[in-house]
Amino acid sequence: MIALPDTDSEDELPPGWEERATDDGTVCYVNQQGKTSQWTHPRTGRSKRITGELPLGWEKYYDEQGKRFMFLNKETQQRTNVDPRLAFAVEEPTQNVAQVRQRFDSCSTALQVLHGKDLHGRTALITGANCGIGYETARSLAHHGCEIIFACRNRSSAEAAIERIAQERPAARSRCRFAALDLSSLRSVQRFVEEIKQSVSHIDYLILNAGVFALPYTRTVDGLETTFQVSHLSHFYLTLQLETLFDYKTRIIVLSSESHRFANLPVENLAVHHLSPPPEKYWSMMAYNNAKLCNVLFAQELAQRWKQRGISVFSLHPGNMVSSDLSRNYWFYRLLFAIVRPFTKSLQQAAATSIYCATANELTGLSGLYFNNCFFCEPSKLSKSAALQQQLWKLSENLIAELVEQEQH
């Protein structure tokens, strides 16, 4: 049984008040003592709305006089005039980030964040969904009806992940599918996009989850340092190539890390050798830090460029040293991650911020924010440099154009 988050005391109604829902889903507040009603919460001053389909097993019908709606629980035969979705009513979205209240924290799990949500009809594309945080993200969304595209390199691993989800929720099997994507190859990204565009008309959630950590020095088939291409450049290319599948409902989630605060990229004259260094100047930890900074820079610039289209773009930190497959490349980090495991987030907790950014109603209309523990916070000063954001964008565009042209000849 999943433990639900504690009730926010600020959201509790004063004595004598109750919630009711209108036919269009707007929540009103009735003061039984004063015989008055209002559209805003008597304590928070916020308005709410019920959304989505009725919970499983409930149906809505008119009473015998045909004057008001009633609700029937077909399993228990319970009848009530109270809409069961009131328990999951959400605050109307705000354009002011200062008005967003923190509902979850570092202890919250992805499934807690999704409690009461119906995601049937939504489509999520998740890179690296076969293991770790990506798997828990996919699993949680699939449990709530979302269709999942497992964008992974390893077919057998992805299909095994889908099978585990199907064992827990058989109906989810038909909603999950694998599509081959190798982020170390721009050609693979191209083929992946071609396949997706033939089978999908719209993407609601693009979750750029995949990444690498602590790699020995290696180059991709495109000749770039692997950490940089896998963690940033291929995700950059993937996002722009999928642009026609996005609309004002789409949210793009970029997984970064607090490690972005320790990057050493220059603010001026950013060049390829800073991002994809030669072997003699390579340090795996700094390569990771710089790639994570690229993630935030990309998210900030993308949010700015696409803000008129209503597309929301968020970057986030999932948690420190979470026990995932990220540490697989070096024995020291595997040992270190194992030692600190009792003191870090579970994978369900680590996936919570990705899920929150993708689905939270209160984030509608907002973009360009950086999140940690399911709440926005300030990213590094360097990541907020408009000049560096634009330099990285231009460099990424030019680098991809050059590599794609080489591939065609």
Curated annotation (Swiss-Prot):
Binding residues for NADP(+): 128-134
Write down the superkingdom of origin. Answer: Eukaryota
Main localization category: cytoplasm
Identify the catalytic residues: 288
Do you know which InterPro entries this protein is assigned to? Answer: NAD(P)-bd_dom_sf, SDR_fam, WW_dom, WW_dom_sf, WWOX_SDR_c-like
What EC number(s) has UniProt assigned to this enzyme?
1.1.1.-
KW Cytoplasm (keyword) present:
yes
Task: Name the Gene Ontology biological process terms.
Answer: apoptotic process; defense response to Gram-negative bacterium; regulation of reactive oxygen species metabolic process; response to ionizing radiation; Wnt signaling pathway
Region (Disordered) residue spans: 1-23
Record's Gene Ontology CC terms?
Answer: cytoplasm; Golgi apparatus; lysosome; mitochondrion
Binding-site residues, substrate: 257
Q: Name one GO molecular function term.
A: oxidoreductase activity
Its keywords, alphabetically, are: Apoptosis, Cytoplasm, Golgi apparatus, Lysosome, Mitochondrion, NADP, Oxidoreductase, Phosphoprotein, Repeat, Wnt signaling pathway
- Compartments it resides in: Cytoplasm; Mitochondrion; Golgi apparatus; Lysosome
Q: Where are the transmembrane segments?
A: none
Q: What is its biological role?
A: Putative oxidoreductase. May control genotoxic stress-induced cell death. May play a role in TGFB1 signaling and TGFB1-mediated cell death. May also play a role in tumor necrosis factor (TNF)-mediated cell death. May play a role in Wnt signaling.
The entry assigns this protein to a family as follows:
Belongs to the short-chain dehydrogenases/reductases (SDR) family.
Name used for this protein in its record: WW domain-containing oxidoreductase
**Which species does this protein come from?**
Drosophila melanogaster (Fruit fly)
